Design a protein with these regions (language model features):
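Structural motif
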Residues: 20-22, 42-45, 105-107, 127-130, ...
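A short helix->loop->beta-strand "cap" motif at the edges of active sites that frequently abuts
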Residues: 70-71, 122, 166-170
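Glycine-rich adenosine-cofactor-binding loop
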Residues: 79-82, 89-122, 126-130
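Rossmann-like adenosine-cofactor binding region
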Residues: 136-191
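Adenosine-phosphate binding glycine-rich loop
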Residues: 170-224
Length: 224
């Protein structure tokens, strides 16, 4: 995905890497061997540990960073879960501003999505799960209703598992693997998150030059 966008922008000398680290100590050891500018997508547990380690300012309501860059020695980070979810919803024809989200889960992904959804003017129905969402800037958007436009279960069991059936016009999932089609919501959201990271971190000065989400998904399907 990074290679597709970088080639679209005319950038060269791009190399894909995979860095596995289950602790900050492992991250520090592996990152120390890498030279040049770096862009990493972070997952659990690193996305919760990296802000303090790199001394990055983050939203205390979300408390995680899933995209980090090191450019000319300067580290920056952002959480793109919320903005990526909104962009993916718009791609499938749902406008968050005028829609109601039924949300189950209380982890950082759920909080990021709730924050972005509320900030965009949408309404939220909370579904009871294993982990309840904390109080936050999304409180003003929470309503008591049975009618939801879109639903997502972010509270599946450890190691994955089936989502519960939720009452909404459409229910989406952000779980995917190498066999997931590129027209599935999970892949659409990942691609949207990637573009948001380009806008926020890697090339904010070239926002207008970035490919559209539709074009990126088309290129991903071709190169699969």
């Amino acid at each position: 995905m990074f290679r597709i966008v970088s080639e679209y922008l005319g950038l060269s000398e791009v190399k894909d890497i995979y860095l596995e680290a289950k602790s900050i100590e492992e991250f520090e050891e592996r990152i120390g061997h890498l030279k040049g500018d770096i862009w990493l997508s972070c997952t659990t547990p690193i996305k919760h540990l990296i802000p303090k380690y790199l001394q990055l300012e983050i939203s205390e309501d979300i408390n995680s960073i899933n995209q980090i860059t090191r450019i000319k020695g300067d580290w920056k980070g952002v959480n793109t879960d919320g903005l990526g979810f909104l962009a993916a919803c718009r791609h499938i024809g749902i406008e968050p501003t005028y829609s109601t989200l039924r949300l189950r889960g209380g982890g950082s992904t759920a909080r990021s999505i709730a924050e972005a959804w509320a900030a965009d003017g949408g309404k939220i129905i909370l579904e009871t799960g294993r982990r309840e969402i904390t109080r936050g800037p999304w409180d003003k958007a929470i309503i008591d209703s049975e009618d939801a436009t879109i639903a997502i279960d972010l509270d599946t069991g450890p190691g994955g598992g089936e989502s519960i059936k939720m009452n909404a016009e459409i229910q989406v999932s952000i779980s995917y693997d190498e066999d997931t089609d590129y027209n599935q919501f999970a892949v659409i959201m990942v691609a949207a998150q990637h573009l948001e990271a380009w806008k926020e971190l890697y090339a904010p000065h070239r926002k207008e030059d970035l490919p559209s989400l539709s074009l990126l998904l088309k290129e991903l399907a071709i190169t699969k």
